[in-house]
């Protein structure tokens, strides 16, 4: 978890105590106990722990743009909420331009400042500002159902 990349090839640790302390501090903010698992292989972590760690790792270096593709899809509802709260916090703190792909209509309405619905490569809904704020889940679902009926689904 903490810079283990070179260990497989017999290389020494690529980190120092200050960096490990920084990782521990960042991971502690998640509230998932990951700060005590720096020696654990990533593959043995739960799906939620891996998603939280991946999100944190992807935003530790200076970036301006973040792409999230169904980053809560395989998680249980409680962990998905935690990941969304963490995502919202990181995006706001770092002022990141973010594209989040989701099929969770509540997340589509609740998060972000613009909502776009795509169908076969075309934009069929684009709402921002007050118009997005006033958009309901039912409105999005109605549009989705209309598209599904047109496609024969």
Regions found by a protein language model. Give the residues of each.
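H-loop/switch region of ABC-family ATPase nucleotide-binding domains
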Residues: 102-103
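A short, surface-exposed alpha-helical micro-motif characterized by mixed small hydrophobic
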Residues: 108-110
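A short, proline-enriched helix->beta-strand linker immediately N-terminal to the Walker B motif
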Residues: 59-64
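Conserved ABC nucleotide-binding domain
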Residues: 26-43
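Helical segment within the ABC ATPase nucleotide-binding domain
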Residues: 81-93
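Conserved beta-strand-loop-alpha-helix hinge in the C-terminal portion
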Residues: 122-146
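Helix N-cap at the start of a conserved alpha-helix in ABC-type nucleotide-binding domains
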Residues: 77-79
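Catalytic Walker B motif of ABC-type/P-loop ATPase nucleotide-binding domains
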Residues: 66-69
């Amino acid at each position: 978890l903490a810079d283990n990349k070179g260990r497989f090839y017999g290389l020494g640790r690529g980190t120092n105590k200050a960096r490990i302390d920084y990782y521990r501090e960042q991971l502690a903010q998640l509230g998932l106990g990951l700060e005590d698992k720096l020696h654990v292989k990533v593959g043995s972590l739960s799906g939620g722990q891996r998603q939280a760690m991946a999100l944190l790792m992807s935003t530790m270096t200076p970036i301006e743009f973040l792409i999230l593709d169904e980053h809560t899809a395989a998680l249980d509802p409680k962990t998905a909420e935690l990941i969304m709260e963490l995502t919202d916090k990181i995006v706001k703190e770092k002022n990141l331009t973010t594209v989040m792909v989701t099929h969770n209509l509540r997340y589509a309405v609740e998060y972000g400042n613009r909502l776009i619905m795509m169908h076969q490569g075309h934009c069929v809904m684009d709402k921002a500002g007050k118009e997005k704020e006033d958009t309901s889940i039912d409105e999005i679902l109605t549009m989705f159902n209309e598209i599904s009926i047109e496609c024969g689904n």
